[in-house]
Amino acid sequence: SCGDLTFELNHARGETEDATWTWVPERKLLSPGDLFIYAVPNAGNPQKVQRYSGEWAAALRRMAALGAEIMLSGHGLPIFGADRIRVALLDSAELLDSIEAQVLALMNTGCTLDRVIHEVKIPQHLRDKPHLRPVYDDPQFLVRNVWRLYGGWYDGEPDNLLPAPRAEQAREWVDLAGGIDRVLERVATLRDEGNLRMACHLVEYAVIAEPGSKPAHALRAEVYA
């Protein structure tokens, strides 16, 4: 406590195993820390330790039940009003729960990580919420994180258990395509068509197969720009 105010510190597992959120009952003020960031929850950062979508969602639901009238989140502007705060917290929890449930259901049918990534869908009524925009984490990153928690590093593709070096793979694919010029021509076409994901795959093979190719590096820079 501090003066007439009580600061209740609550533990949760979210971005880390030791996240803390704070409740000040006298002011009906909630500080969720990074458990709410006014965007898709940061539960899938590609270069961070394991994160816990299910427990994260549970913490958000606990917060929503408090009836806070002021919320000071770890990122973004304050939110005022009990109804607005409750909706924001429960929407975030629903997103996390939905992704985890879909991933587990698909894993239990024997799907590979690739299939899971592309088959999990965000509920339609959550897609356009201003507090769930994918401005930091893409929902596909969250899918990968749930897979890692329950399925480990193996993606379900047998050829990835003991793979050949990627440089060798790249040279084989470029040779099969008829050489690097053919590959770069196709990359440029894909770029112009707006198929940037596939363009990224092919240009990476080109650069890896011939790392000294200036045209390959130049096109790669354009694709990722």
Locate each region found by the language model.
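Active-site HxH/HxHxD metal-binding segment of metal-dependent hydrolases
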Residues: 1
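Metallo-beta-lactamase
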Residues: 6-109
